[in-house]
């Protein structure tokens, strides 16, 4: 599963999910993409589950790009702990996703295969998503 090798600080504030994605909202690498339509935290386990589902469906063909990275640590307190005594220990990692963000990109497969693979991956996500096809002029390298 994805997680940072090291970070400057172990614990972060929760923050807010206001607005739409201004970066990472265009198809850059592949021909097909899965785009988020809602704001959410996506855990490293969910990202990995989506990746596995897509690679299994596409079999040998195709290349897959994961466009999000879980760089925010989420802390949790042990169960039945009294209030106070500081913030809990980092438990898992999430990627902060806003509407419009591209989650995955794919190329080297037909549109029907890509659409089906992305649909399976979308079931693993906690948000609504949409399937995108890059136009000829939109791909930048």
Swiss-Prot record:
Alphabetical list of SUPFAM superfamilies matching this protein: Ribosomal protein L16p/L10e (SSF54686)
Keywords: Chloroplast, Plastid, Ribonucleoprotein, Ribosomal protein
Plastid recorded as keyword: yes
Any GO molecular function: structural constituent of ribosome
UniProt key word Ribonucleoprotein: yes
Xref: CDD domains: Ribosomal_L16_L10e
GO biological process: mitochondrial translation
Gene3D superfamilies: Ribosomal protein L10e/L16 (3.90.1170.10)
Ranges annotated as biased composition (Basic residues): 1-17
One Pfam family matching this protein: Ribosomal_L16
PANTHER family with a match to the protein in the record: 50S/60S RIBOSOMAL PROTEIN L16, LARGE RIBOSOMAL SUBUNIT PROTEIN UL16M
Record text on subunit structure and interactions: Part of the 50S ribosomal subunit.
Protein name per UniProt: Large ribosomal subunit protein uL16c
Gene encoding the protein: rpl16
């Amino acid at each position: 599963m994805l997680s940072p090798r090291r970070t400057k600080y172990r614990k972060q504030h929760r923050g807010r999910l206001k607005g739409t994605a201004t970066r990472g909202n265009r198809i850059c690498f592949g021909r097909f993409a899965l785009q988020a339509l809602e704001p959410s935290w996506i855990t490293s386990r969910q990202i990995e589950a989506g990746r596995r589902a897509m690679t299994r469906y596409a079999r040998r063909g195709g290349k897959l790009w994961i466009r999000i990275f879980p760089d925010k640590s989420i802390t949790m307190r042990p169960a039945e702990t009294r209030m106070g005594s500081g913030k809990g220990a980092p438990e898992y990692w999430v990627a902060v996703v806003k509407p419009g963000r591209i989650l995955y990109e794919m190329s080297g497969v037909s549109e029907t295969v890509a659409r089906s693979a992305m649909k399976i991956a979308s079931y693993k996500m906690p948000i609504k998503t949409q399937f995108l096809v890059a136009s000829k002029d939109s791909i930048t390298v």
